[in-house]
C-alpha cells in the first residue's frame, strides 16, 4: 500500500512540474500577445522612427547559425515581429503572415499572429486544467493507499496487543 501511495505521489509531482512549465509558457505567450497587440496599434499609427530588428537562424538543436536584419522605415504602416516572437511561433508551428517574405506586418497582418497566439494561450490553459484533474486523481489514490496502509497497521497493532495480553 505504501509503495502504491509513493507511486501516486510521484505521478502527481510529475504533473505538478508539467503544470509549472506550462504556466511559464503561458506567461511568455501572454507577453508575446501583448507585444503583438501593441505592434498592431503602432502599425496603424505609423512608425515614429526607423525600427531595425535582428533575427537569428537556428539549427535543429536551437543553436544560432546566422543572423540578418530587417528595417521598417519611419512613417510606414508596418513594423517587425521581435526575434523572440518569430522563434517561439516557428518552434510551435504557429501561423503568422509571411507576405513579402519578411517579418514586417501591417495592422491587418498582425491579426494572423494575434489569433495564433490567442489559440496557443487557450490550448495551454486547457492542458493545464486537464493536468490538474490528473493531480486530483493521483492525490485521491495516494490518500486511499495511505488510509489502507494505516488500517493495516492499526489491525496489526490490535493483533499484537491481543497476543501480548493473551500471554
Go through the PLM ranges and name each one.
Residues 85, 113, 117, 159-160:
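Generic structural signal of hydrophobic/aromatic residues within well-ordered alpha-helices
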Residues 1, 15, 22, 29, ...:
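Amphipathic coiled-coil alpha-helices
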Residues 34, 45-47, 79, 83, ...:
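Detector for Asparagine
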Residues 129-167:
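Proline-poor, low-complexity alpha-helical tail modules
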Residues 75-77, 93, 99-129:
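Fold-level signal for large, globular catalytic cores of enzyme and receptor domains
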Residues 1-105:
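Low-complexity, intrinsically disordered export/secretion signals at extreme N-termini
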Amino acid at each position: 500500500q505504501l509503495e502504491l501511495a509513493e507511486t501516486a505521489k510521484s505521478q502527481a509531482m510529475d504533473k505538478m512540474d508539467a503544470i509549472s512549465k506550462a504556466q511559464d509558457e503561458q506567461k511568455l505567450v501572454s507577453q508575446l500577445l501583448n507585444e503583438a497587440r501593441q505592434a498592431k496599434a503602432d502599425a496603424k499609427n505609423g512608425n515614429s522612427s526607423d525600427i531595425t530588428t535582428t533575427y537569428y537562424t537556428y539549427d535543429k538543436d536551437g543553436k544560432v547559425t546566422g543572423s540578418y536584419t530587417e528595417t521598417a522605415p519611419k512613417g510606414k504602416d508596418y513594423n517587425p515581429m521581435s526575434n523572440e516572437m518569430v522563434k517561439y511561433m516557428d518552434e510551435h508551428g504557429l501561423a503568422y503572415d509571411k507576405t513579402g517574405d519578411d517579418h514586417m506586418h501591417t495592422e491587418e497582418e498582425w491579426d494572423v499572429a494575434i489569433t495564433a497566439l490567442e489559440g496557443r494561450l487557450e490550448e495551454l490553459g486547457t492542458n493545464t486544467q486537464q493536468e490538474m484533474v490528473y493531480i486530483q486523481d493521483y492525490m485521491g489514490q495516494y490518500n486511499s493507499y495511505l488510509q489502507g496502509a494505516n488500517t493495516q497497521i492499526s489491525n496489526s497493532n490490535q493483533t499484537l496487543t491481543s497476543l501480548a495480553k493473551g500471554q
